[in-house]
């Protein structure tokens, strides 16, 4: 796994999936065979296959939460914001702390139980849609399709 820390000015980007997207990471270590986000590789400078790299976005600027007022925000539209590196970097938690008092419609998608760490913050978000992937209970099939999610 190739890991790079990259400096960014902002975590927000305009999107057709919502009005804004927040992706604190580029790439994803989950290596799911069915992943729709693998098209993102062409926008990176990586020669590695999708699932073999992750860029950790480091942003010192606070999110301009005024932009998000009454907007639809999709967090982790092309990565998993609770990927294993989130345990170290805590970027998702930092972002959620900024969104707690913002009246926006937040959609968050993950397949990692690390999401449980942030339940204290997620409970405070007024309009939250939390999607958690549970792909299969067949461990052999899971190992073939999805190297990351657990059935425990």
Q: Where do the protein language model's features map onto the residues?
A:
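N-terminal [4Fe-4S]-dependent radical SAM core
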Residues: 1-31, 36-74
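Conserved AdoMet/S-adenosylmethionine-binding subsite of the radical SAM
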Residues: 58-152
């Amino acid at each position: 796994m190739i890991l790079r820390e990259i400096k960014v000015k902002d975590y927000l980007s305009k999107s057709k999936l919502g009005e804004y997207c927040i992706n604190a990471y580029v790439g994803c270590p989950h290596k799911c065979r069915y992943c729709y986000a693998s098209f993102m590789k062409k926008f990176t400078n990586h020669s590695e296959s999708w699932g073999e790299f992750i860029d950790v976005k480091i942003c010192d600027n606070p999110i301009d939460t005024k932009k998000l007022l009454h907007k639809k925000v999709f967090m982790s539209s092309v990565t998993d914001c609770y990927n294993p590196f989130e345990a170290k970097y805590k970027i998702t938690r930092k972002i959620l702390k900024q969104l707690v008092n913002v009246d926006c419609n937040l959609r968050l998608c993950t397949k990692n139980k690390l999401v449980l760490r942030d339940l204290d913050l997620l409970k405070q978000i007024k309009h939250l849609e939390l999607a958690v992937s549970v792909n299969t209970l067949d461990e052999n099939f899971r190992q073939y399709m999805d190297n990351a999610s657990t059935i425990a």
